[in-house]
Amino acid sequence: MGGECGDAWGVAESFLNTLAGPWDFLDPRYPVPQHICEFTYDLIQQGKLTFDKSENDDKVMTFHDSCNVARASRMGDTPGGQFEIPRAIIRATCNHFYDMDEDTIRDRTFCCGGGGGLLTDDLMELRVKGAKPRMDALNNVIQEKGVTHMAAICAICKTQFSKVLPYYGMDMSQIISLHQLVGDAIVLTPDPEDADDDDDDDDAD
């Protein structure tokens, strides 16, 4: 399973079956490789996850499409899944979500400015300049819709934005993981079998 990392997912989606397969001994219901967002989305579609979206009401969300995920890979069974699946997860876990301008998202997304080996403090000036197109789009949706946080599913993007957001008058905490939203909103209910076990323990006492 691929995590929230654009580079790792690009490699896994393109080459994992070729280099490390075949995976015919695994459950055929799950594609190999599978992104963590696909796995979470499948559970949501099956009704196996319950969320209290109000737990994320302190956030007004937008989403950054990371380069490697947006233009060098895919998710799910339909074209464009890499764009729609993360947004579906946000909508399932949050009450307030707004996309940035259409010309700045999905396959027209901007680089975060930290990829391609630039993620070093020695190149901070270049990184800040490289992030400007995304920062401008983010600032626009902040002004127009009151967005407070931006989610991303790439470790490089999240690290980059946590460093450069303050250069644009924003807080480093405004970039978050998609699955942070999942973790904050998920409702954990006890398994009925666990409850039966507790009853048995009480009877034994």
Where do the PLM segments sit?
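Iron-sulfur cluster-binding electron-transfer modules in prokaryotic oxidoreductases
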Residues: 1-205
